[in-house]
Protein backbone atom coordinates (compact mmCIF):
# COMPACT_ATOMS: atom_id res chain seq x y z
CA UNK A 1 0.00 0.00 0.00
CA UNK A 2 2.97 2.36 0.50
CA UNK A 3 3.70 2.03 -3.21
CA UNK A 4 0.39 3.77 -3.96
CA UNK A 5 1.59 7.11 -2.57
CA UNK A 6 2.66 9.51 -5.35
CA UNK A 7 6.43 10.08 -5.43
CA UNK A 8 8.19 13.39 -5.89
CA UNK A 9 9.50 14.16 -9.35
CA UNK A 10 11.68 16.83 -10.99
CA UNK A 11 8.77 19.28 -11.17
CA UNK A 12 7.45 18.72 -7.65
CA UNK A 13 7.18 21.71 -5.33
CA UNK A 14 6.67 21.98 -1.59
CA UNK A 15 3.02 22.70 -2.31
CA UNK A 16 2.39 19.88 -4.77
CA UNK A 17 4.08 17.48 -2.35
CA UNK A 18 1.21 18.01 0.09
CA UNK A 19 0.39 20.71 2.62
CA UNK A 20 -0.53 19.64 6.15
CA UNK A 21 -2.15 21.89 8.76
CA UNK A 22 -2.20 20.99 12.45
CA UNK A 23 -4.19 22.60 15.27
CA UNK A 24 -3.46 21.90 18.90
CA UNK A 25 -0.98 22.56 21.64
CA UNK A 26 -1.45 23.92 25.13
CA UNK A 27 0.75 24.80 28.07
CA UNK A 28 2.76 21.69 29.00
CA UNK A 29 1.76 19.85 25.81
CA UNK A 30 3.56 21.72 23.04
CA UNK A 31 5.64 18.66 22.19
CA UNK A 32 2.64 16.83 20.74
CA UNK A 33 2.18 19.36 17.93
CA UNK A 34 5.90 19.52 17.30
CA UNK A 35 6.17 15.74 16.91
CA UNK A 36 3.09 15.48 14.69
CA UNK A 37 4.36 18.21 12.36
CA UNK A 38 7.89 16.82 12.10
CA UNK A 39 6.51 13.34 11.44
CA UNK A 40 4.35 14.76 8.64
CA UNK A 41 7.38 16.31 6.95
CA UNK A 42 9.47 13.17 7.39
CA UNK A 43 6.63 11.16 5.85
CA UNK A 44 6.71 13.26 2.71
CA UNK A 45 4.54 16.33 3.23
CA UNK A 46 6.15 19.29 1.52
CA UNK A 47 4.80 21.96 3.84
CA UNK A 48 3.44 21.96 7.39
CA UNK A 49 1.76 24.74 9.35
CA UNK A 50 0.70 24.61 13.00
CA UNK A 51 -2.11 26.66 14.55
CA UNK A 52 -1.18 27.10 18.20
CA UNK A 53 -2.03 29.42 21.11
CA UNK A 54 -0.49 32.84 20.45
CA UNK A 55 1.17 32.97 23.85
CA UNK A 56 3.02 29.73 23.08
CA UNK A 57 4.00 30.48 19.47
CA UNK A 58 7.56 31.43 20.40
CA UNK A 59 8.17 27.83 21.44
CA UNK A 60 7.51 26.70 17.88
CA UNK A 61 9.35 29.58 16.21
CA UNK A 62 12.52 28.72 18.11
CA UNK A 63 12.34 24.93 18.21
CA UNK A 64 10.95 24.14 14.78
CA UNK A 65 12.38 26.15 11.89
CA UNK A 66 11.08 23.66 9.30
CA UNK A 67 7.44 24.28 10.26
CA UNK A 68 5.35 27.43 9.78
CA UNK A 69 3.33 28.65 12.78
CA UNK A 70 0.18 30.70 13.27
CA UNK A 71 -0.45 32.21 16.69
CA UNK A 72 -4.16 31.97 17.51
CA UNK A 73 -5.61 34.53 19.94
CA UNK A 74 -7.97 34.03 22.81
CA UNK A 75 -6.83 31.56 25.42
CA UNK A 76 -4.45 31.40 28.34
CA UNK A 77 -2.07 28.82 26.93
CA UNK A 78 -4.76 26.95 25.00
CA UNK A 79 -7.00 27.22 21.94
CA UNK A 80 -10.55 28.50 22.63
CA UNK A 81 -13.58 29.64 20.58
CA UNK A 82 -11.92 33.02 19.97
CA UNK A 83 -9.18 31.11 18.11
CA UNK A 84 -11.60 29.77 15.49
CA UNK A 85 -10.99 32.24 12.65
CA UNK A 86 -7.22 31.82 12.84
CA UNK A 87 -7.53 28.03 12.97
CA UNK A 88 -9.82 27.91 9.95
CA UNK A 89 -7.50 30.19 7.95
CA UNK A 90 -4.64 27.81 8.67
CA UNK A 91 -6.57 24.93 7.11
CA UNK A 92 -7.79 26.81 4.01
CA UNK A 93 -5.02 25.60 1.68
CA UNK A 94 -4.23 22.32 3.40
CA UNK A 95 -4.46 19.06 1.50
CA UNK A 96 -4.94 17.32 4.86
CA UNK A 97 -4.95 18.25 8.50
CA UNK A 98 -4.72 17.09 12.10
CA UNK A 99 -6.80 18.36 14.99
CA UNK A 100 -6.09 17.60 18.62
CA UNK A 101 -2.43 16.89 19.47
CA UNK A 102 -1.70 18.54 22.80
CA UNK A 103 -5.06 20.35 22.73
CA UNK A 104 -5.66 19.92 26.45
CA UNK A 105 -8.92 19.53 28.32
CA UNK A 106 -9.94 23.14 28.82
CA UNK A 107 -13.73 23.41 28.27
CA UNK A 108 -13.11 26.21 25.79
CA UNK A 109 -10.80 23.97 23.77
CA UNK A 110 -13.50 21.30 23.59
CA UNK A 111 -16.05 23.91 22.53
CA UNK A 112 -13.70 25.05 19.77
CA UNK A 113 -13.18 21.48 18.62
CA UNK A 114 -16.88 20.79 18.24
CA UNK A 115 -17.34 23.97 16.22
CA UNK A 116 -14.26 24.03 14.02
CA UNK A 117 -13.98 20.35 13.08
CA UNK A 118 -17.33 20.54 11.28
CA UNK A 119 -16.10 23.51 9.24
CA UNK A 120 -12.69 22.22 8.15
CA UNK A 121 -13.07 21.18 4.52
CA UNK A 122 -9.81 19.22 4.23
CA UNK A 123 -9.45 15.51 5.03
CA UNK A 124 -8.80 15.44 8.75
CA UNK A 125 -7.07 13.22 11.30
CA UNK A 126 -8.52 13.67 14.80
CA UNK A 127 -6.40 12.53 17.72
CA UNK A 128 -5.89 12.87 21.48
CA UNK A 129 -8.05 15.53 23.14
CA UNK A 130 -9.56 16.31 19.76
CA UNK A 131 -11.24 12.93 20.20
CA UNK A 132 -12.12 13.53 23.84
CA UNK A 133 -14.05 16.64 22.80
CA UNK A 134 -16.53 14.29 21.10
CA UNK A 135 -17.00 11.89 24.02
CA UNK A 136 -20.56 10.63 23.77
CA UNK A 137 -21.08 12.81 20.68
CA UNK A 138 -19.43 10.66 18.04
CA UNK A 139 -22.31 10.97 15.59
CA UNK A 140 -21.66 14.70 15.22
CA UNK A 141 -18.59 13.86 13.12
CA UNK A 142 -20.77 12.25 10.44
CA UNK A 143 -21.79 15.73 9.25
CA UNK A 144 -18.27 16.56 8.06
CA UNK A 145 -18.07 17.19 4.32
CA UNK A 146 -14.53 15.77 3.95
CA UNK A 147 -13.02 12.42 4.96
CA UNK A 148 -12.20 11.85 8.62
CA UNK A 149 -9.72 9.50 10.29
CA UNK A 150 -9.95 8.89 14.04
CA UNK A 151 -6.90 7.50 15.85
CA UNK A 152 -8.01 6.47 19.36
CA UNK A 153 -6.52 4.09 21.87
CA UNK A 154 -8.96 1.91 23.83
CA UNK A 155 -9.58 4.54 26.50
CA UNK A 156 -10.41 7.25 23.97
CA UNK A 157 -12.64 4.93 21.97
CA UNK A 158 -14.42 3.96 25.18
CA UNK A 159 -15.19 7.63 25.86
CA UNK A 160 -16.41 8.16 22.29
CA UNK A 161 -18.76 5.18 22.52
CA UNK A 162 -19.54 5.64 26.24
CA UNK A 163 -18.25 2.17 27.03
CA UNK A 164 -15.77 0.80 29.54
CA UNK A 165 -12.25 0.45 28.10
CA UNK A 166 -12.26 -3.20 29.20
CA UNK A 167 -15.27 -3.79 26.97
CA UNK A 168 -13.45 -2.11 24.09
CA UNK A 169 -10.43 -4.33 24.76
CA UNK A 170 -12.56 -7.46 24.73
CA UNK A 171 -14.30 -6.52 21.46
CA UNK A 172 -11.75 -4.43 19.59
CA UNK A 173 -12.87 -5.11 16.03
CA UNK A 174 -16.59 -4.77 16.77
CA UNK A 175 -15.96 -1.53 18.68
CA UNK A 176 -13.82 -0.02 15.93
CA UNK A 177 -16.42 -0.92 13.31
CA UNK A 178 -19.21 0.56 15.41
CA UNK A 179 -17.34 3.84 15.80
CA UNK A 180 -16.45 3.99 12.10
CA UNK A 181 -20.06 3.55 11.08
CA UNK A 182 -21.42 6.04 13.60
CA UNK A 183 -18.87 8.73 12.70
CA UNK A 184 -18.73 8.01 8.97
CA UNK A 185 -14.97 7.79 9.39
CA UNK A 186 -11.95 5.53 9.18
CA UNK A 187 -11.01 4.37 12.68
CA UNK A 188 -7.46 3.42 13.65
CA UNK A 189 -7.77 1.61 16.98
CA UNK A 190 -4.23 1.67 18.29
CA UNK A 191 -2.52 -1.25 20.01
CA UNK A 192 0.01 -3.95 19.24
CA UNK A 193 -2.56 -5.32 16.78
CA UNK A 194 -3.71 -1.92 15.51
CA UNK A 195 -7.01 -2.21 13.63
CA UNK A 196 -7.95 -0.01 10.68
CA UNK A 197 -11.56 -0.04 9.51
CA UNK A 198 -14.01 2.12 7.63
CA UNK A 199 -16.89 0.07 9.00
CA UNK A 200 -16.70 -2.42 6.13
CA UNK A 201 -13.07 -2.98 5.17
CA UNK A 202 -10.70 -4.14 7.90
CA UNK A 203 -6.91 -4.35 8.15
CA UNK A 204 -4.91 -5.54 11.16
CA UNK A 205 -1.27 -4.69 11.78
CA UNK A 206 0.92 -7.78 12.09
CA UNK A 207 4.23 -6.00 12.79
CA UNK A 208 5.02 -6.06 16.49
CA UNK A 209 6.92 -2.95 17.65
CA UNK A 210 7.30 -2.78 21.47
CA UNK A 211 9.44 0.34 21.05
CA UNK A 212 6.27 2.30 20.26
CA UNK A 213 5.07 1.94 23.87
CA UNK A 214 6.36 5.39 24.80
CA UNK A 215 4.91 8.89 24.98
CA UNK A 216 4.52 10.80 21.73
CA UNK A 217 4.41 7.94 19.26
CA UNK A 218 0.68 8.46 18.75
CA UNK A 219 1.42 12.02 17.64
CA UNK A 220 3.99 10.61 15.22
CA UNK A 221 1.36 8.28 13.75
CA UNK A 222 -1.06 11.19 13.29
CA UNK A 223 1.56 13.16 11.40
CA UNK A 224 2.42 10.25 9.15
CA UNK A 225 -1.25 9.60 8.41
CA UNK A 226 -1.91 13.22 7.48
CA UNK A 227 1.15 13.30 5.23
CA UNK A 228 -0.03 10.27 3.28
CA UNK A 229 -3.49 11.83 2.95
CA UNK A 230 -1.90 15.04 1.69
CA UNK A 231 0.17 13.07 -0.81
CA UNK A 232 -3.01 11.70 -2.35
CA UNK A 233 -3.87 8.36 -0.77
CA UNK A 234 -7.53 7.73 -0.03
CA UNK A 235 -8.29 7.61 3.73
CA UNK A 236 -8.37 3.85 4.33
CA UNK A 237 -5.18 3.32 2.33
CA UNK A 238 -3.48 6.28 4.02
CA UNK A 239 -4.31 4.91 7.45
CA UNK A 240 -3.09 1.42 6.57
CA UNK A 241 0.13 2.72 5.04
CA UNK A 242 0.81 4.94 8.04
CA UNK A 243 0.27 2.10 10.51
CA UNK A 244 2.66 -0.15 8.58
CA UNK A 245 5.35 2.52 8.24
CA UNK A 246 4.93 3.56 11.89
CA UNK A 247 5.51 0.00 13.08
CA UNK A 248 8.53 -0.33 10.79
CA UNK A 249 9.92 2.93 12.13
CA UNK A 250 9.49 1.70 15.68
CA UNK A 251 11.45 -1.44 14.94
CA UNK A 252 14.12 0.50 13.04
CA UNK A 253 14.48 2.92 15.96
CA UNK A 254 14.92 0.06 18.43
CA UNK A 255 17.65 -1.46 16.28
CA UNK A 256 19.40 1.88 15.91
CA UNK A 257 19.42 2.86 19.60
CA UNK A 258 20.02 -0.67 20.83
CA UNK A 259 16.89 -1.52 22.84
CA UNK A 260 13.11 -0.98 22.56
CA UNK A 261 13.05 0.41 26.10
CA UNK A 262 15.42 3.23 25.13
CA UNK A 263 13.42 4.52 22.17
CA UNK A 264 11.80 7.95 22.40
CA UNK A 265 9.35 9.46 19.93
CA UNK A 266 12.08 11.51 18.28
CA UNK A 267 13.93 8.30 17.43
CA UNK A 268 10.81 7.05 15.66
CA UNK A 269 10.58 10.27 13.64
CA UNK A 270 14.22 9.92 12.62
CA UNK A 271 13.49 6.35 11.49
CA UNK A 272 10.59 7.27 9.20
CA UNK A 273 12.64 7.70 5.97
CA UNK A 274 13.58 4.03 5.50
CA UNK A 275 10.26 2.86 6.94
CA UNK A 276 8.09 4.90 4.58
CA UNK A 277 9.74 3.59 1.40
CA UNK A 278 7.75 0.95 -0.51
CA UNK A 279 10.94 -1.14 -0.58
CA UNK A 280 11.59 -0.57 3.11
CA UNK A 281 12.23 -3.34 5.65
CA UNK A 282 9.81 -6.25 5.26
CA UNK A 283 8.60 -8.08 8.36
Which residues fall in each region the model found?
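Small-residue (G/A/S/T)-rich helix-start motifs and N-terminal tracts that mark the onset
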Residues: 1-124, 128, 132-149, 154-283
Amino acid sequence: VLALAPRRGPRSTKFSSGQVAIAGGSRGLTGAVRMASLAAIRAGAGYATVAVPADLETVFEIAQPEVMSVGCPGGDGCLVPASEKAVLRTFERAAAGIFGPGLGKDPGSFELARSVVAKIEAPLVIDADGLNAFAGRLGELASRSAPTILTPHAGELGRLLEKDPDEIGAHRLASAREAAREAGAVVVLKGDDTIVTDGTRVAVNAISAPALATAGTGDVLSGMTAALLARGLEPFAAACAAVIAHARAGREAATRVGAPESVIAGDVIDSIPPAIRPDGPVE
